C-alpha cells in the first residue's frame, strides 16, 4: 500500500509538472504571437504574416489540446489502475509494477515533442518576420531654393555634361576609324573628316556627270545601231526577192 501510494504521488507530481510545462509553452506561444502581430502591423504586408502565424498557432493549439486530452485519459486510467491494485495481492502488484515502468518514458516523449513543436513555432515566426520586412521609404526631396536643392541641381548638370562629352568623344573615335588619318587630336580629326567628306562629295558629283554622259552616248549608239539594223534588214529582203525572181526566170 505504501508503494502504491508513493507511485500515486509520483504520478501526480509528474502530471502537475506536465501541465505546468504545457501551460508555459502555451504562454510562450501566445506572447510570441502577440509580438509578431505587433511587429507585422507596421508593415504593408502584415496580413499574410498574421495569417501564417494564426495558422501555425491553430495547429500548435490543436496539438496541445490533443496532448492534454491524452494526458487526462492517461491519468484517469492510472487512477483506475490504482483502485484495482489496492484489491490485488502482492504478487499482482509486483507484476503490475514491472508494467508501469514505461509510463515515465511516454511522458518524457510527450515533453520532448512539445519542445520540438515550440522550436518549430519559433522558426515559423522568424521566417515570417524575415519575409515580410518593410522596405525603406525614399527620402523626401529637398525644398526648392535650398542649399541641398542647388547642390543636387549642380550634380545633375555635371552628369548631363559628362554624358554629352562622352557621346561626342565616342562619335569622334568612330569617325577616326572611318577616315584615313593618323591624327589623335580631336580638332584635327574633325578637320580631316570634313575634308574627306568634301572629297567624297566631289567624287560623287563627278561620277554622276560621267555616268550621265556615258548614258547619253550609249543611247545614241543604240539608236544608230538600230537604224543600221533596219537598213540591213531592208537590203536583205530586197536581195531575197531578186533571188526568187531569178529562180522563176530560169524555170
From Swiss-Prot:
Biased composition annotated in UniProt, kind: Low complexity: 40-56, 117-126
Keywords carried by this UniProt record: Coiled coil, DNA-binding, Nucleus, Transcription, Transcription regulation
The organism's place on the tree of life at top rank: Eukaryota
BP term (GO), one: methionine biosynthetic process
Main location: nucleus
Induction: Repressed during biofilm formation.
Recorded phenotype for the gene knockout or disruption: Leads to auxotrophy for sulfur amino acids.
GO cellular component assignments: nucleus
Location of this chain's protein in the cell: Nucleus
Keyword presence, Coiled coil: yes
SUPFAM superfamilies xrefs: HLH, helix-loop-helix DNA-binding domain
Bias (Polar residues): 67-76, 107-116, 127-140
Function: Transcription factor that binds ribosomal protein gene promoters and rDNA locus with TBF1. Necessary for the expression of genes involved in assimilation of inorganic sulfate. Also required for the expression of respiratory genes and glycolytic genes. Does not bind to centromeres and is not necessary for efficient chromosome segregationas as does S.cerevisiae CBF1.
Name of protein: Transcriptional regulator CBF1
Gene responsible for this protein: CBF1
Amino acid at each position: 500500500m505504501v508503494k502504491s501510494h508513493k507511485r500515486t504521488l509520483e504520478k501526480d507530481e509528474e502530471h502537475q509538472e506536465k501541465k505546468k510545462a504545457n501551460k508555459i509553452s502555451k504562454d510562450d506561444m501566445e506572447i510570441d504571437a502577440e509580438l509578431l502581430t505587433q511587429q507585422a502591423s507596421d508593415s504593408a504586408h502584415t496580413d499574410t504574416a498574421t495569417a501564417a502565424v494564426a495558422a501555425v498557432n491553430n495547429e500548435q493549439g490543436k496539438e496541445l489540446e490533443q496532448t492534454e486530452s491524452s494526458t487526462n485519459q492517461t491519468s484517469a486510467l492510472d487512477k483506475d489502475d490504482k483502485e484495482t491494485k489496492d484489491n490485488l495481492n502482492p504478487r499482482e502488484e509486483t507484476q503490475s509494477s514491472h508494467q508501469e515502468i514505461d509510463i515515465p518514458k511516454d511522458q518524457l516523449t510527450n515533453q520532448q515533442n512539445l519542445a520540438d513543436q515550440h522550436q518549430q513555432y519559433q522558426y515559423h515566426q522568424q521566417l515570417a518576420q524575415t519575409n515580410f520586412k518593410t522596405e525603406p521609404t525614399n527620402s523626401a526631396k529637398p525644398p526648392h531654393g535650398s542649399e541641398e536643392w542647388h547642390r543636387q541641381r549642380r550634380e545633375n548638370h555635371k552628369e548631363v555634361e559628362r554624358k554629352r562629352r562622352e557621346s561626342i568623344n565616342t562619335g569622334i573615335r568612330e569617325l577616326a576609324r572611318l577616315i584615313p588619318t593618323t591624327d589623335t587630336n580631336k580638332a584635327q580629326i574633325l578637320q580631316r573628316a570634313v575634308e574627306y567628306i568634301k572629297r567624297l562629295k566631289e567624287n560623287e558629283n563627278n561620277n554622276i556627270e560621267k555616268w550621265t554622259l556615258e548614258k547619253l552616248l550609249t543611247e545614241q549608239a543604240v539608236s544608230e545601231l538600230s537604224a543600221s539594223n533596219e537598213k540591213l534588214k531592208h537590203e536583205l529582203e530586197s536581195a531575197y526577192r531578186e533571188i526568187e525572181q531569178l529562180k522563176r526566170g530560169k524555170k
